[in-house]
């Protein structure tokens, strides 16, 4: 087998074996009897062969040192490649996240464009929006009126009676170690409250306020001051006037916006 097809390690081992055999022959020839010694020509060839093997061993050792340096450089390059692979993987993850965010943004943008196109095809006048907003605010379905005070029958949401009948109103019982009333007890309390309100002619007034505020047949709201102290008439016209002013302001705004739209 040619030495060029062997690895550096195998070549070094083969050269060492050859040097060992040649050295053994020379030593045996040296200690052999005179009549058994080889001729001087053969001895000279063995010496030349040993010198050539020594040169070949030195050249192979130098080649092995060069290959060791190359292997060291390759190890460093492998580490750099590993680091670059980690950076590439990290960038790939960031790219996927950016792609997901971009896809989501594109989807949302298309939805907004679709909504804009629908709004352009089916426009709604500002007068209709103002009327709709006025209907919502006039019914006090979202919040109490700005001029609402204690005793005002314009309903703020939720009412006191509803809060007292709810779970939040019974939270003190749970804290003290008692069980909350069941649904039947709540329904019974609601029926009792409704019956009390119907019997006294007062609607949507808390139980705590039924003994304090009452409507008289004249249309005035009276507040009871205490046992035997009589009652005091409350003026609710300011609330009605304020509500009327709010309606007039809304009507004026709607008419002005309608005129501006028509222009």
Swiss-Prot record:
Name recorded for this polypeptide: Mediator of RNA polymerase II transcription subunit 4
Region spans: Disordered: 221-263
UniProt-listed PANTHER family: MEDIATOR OF RNA POLYMERASE II TRANSCRIPTION SUBUNIT 4
GO biological process: regulation of transcription by RNA polymerase II
Quaternary state and interactors: Component of the Mediator complex.
Source organism, top-level taxon: Eukaryota
Homology family: Belongs to the Mediator complex subunit 4 family.
Species of provenance: Aedes aegypti
Role according to the record: Component of the Mediator complex, a coactivator involved in the regulated transcription of nearly all RNA polymerase II-dependent genes. Mediator functions as a bridge to convey information from gene-specific regulatory proteins to the basal RNA polymerase II transcription machinery. Mediator is recruited to promoters by direct interactions with regulatory proteins and serves as a scaffold for the assembly of a functional preinitiation complex with RNA polymerase II and the general transcription factors.
Main location, first listed in the record: nucleus
Compositional bias segments (type: Low complexity): 251-263
GO terms for cellular component: core mediator complex; mediator complex
Keywords (A to Z) from UniProt: Activator, Coiled coil, Nucleus, Transcription, Transcription regulation
InterPro entries from the UniProt entry: Mediator_Med4
Annotated coiled-coil segments of the chain: 62-106
Subcellular location as annotated: Nucleus
GO molecular function, one term: transcription coregulator activity
């Amino acid at each position: 087998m040619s030495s060029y097809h062997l690895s550096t390690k195998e070549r070094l081992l083969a050269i060492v074996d050859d040097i060992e055999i040649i050295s053994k022959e020379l030593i045996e020839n040296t200690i052999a009897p005179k009549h058994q010694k080889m001729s001087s020509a053969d001895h000279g060839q063995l010496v030349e062969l040993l010198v050539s093997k020594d040169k070949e061993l030195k050249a192979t050792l130098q080649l092995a040192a060069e290959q060791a340096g190359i292997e060291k450089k390759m190890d460093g390059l492998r580490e750099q490649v590993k680091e670059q692979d980690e950076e590439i993987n990290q960038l790939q993850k960031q790219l996927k996240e950016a792609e997901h965010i971009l896809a989501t943004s594109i989807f949302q943008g298309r939805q907004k464009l679709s909504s804009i196109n629908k709004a352009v095809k089916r426009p709604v006048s500002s007068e209709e929006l103002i009327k709709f907003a006025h209907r919502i605010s006039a019914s006090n379905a979202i919040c109490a009126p700005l001029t609402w005070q204690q005793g005002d029958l314009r309903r703020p949401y939720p009412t006191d009676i509803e809060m007292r009948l709810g779970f939040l109103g019974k939270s003190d019982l749970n804290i003290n170690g008692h069980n909350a009333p069941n649904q039947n007890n709540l329904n019974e309390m609601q029926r009792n409250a409704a019956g009390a309100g119907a019997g006294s002619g007062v609607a949507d007034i808390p139980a705590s306020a039924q003994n304090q505020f009452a409507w008289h047949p004249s249309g005035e709201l009276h507040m009871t001051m205490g046992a035997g102290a009589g009652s005091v008439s409350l003026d609710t016209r300011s609330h009605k006037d304020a509500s009327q002013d709010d309606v007039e302001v809304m009507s004026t705004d709607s008419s002005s916006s309608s005129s501006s739209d028509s222009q």
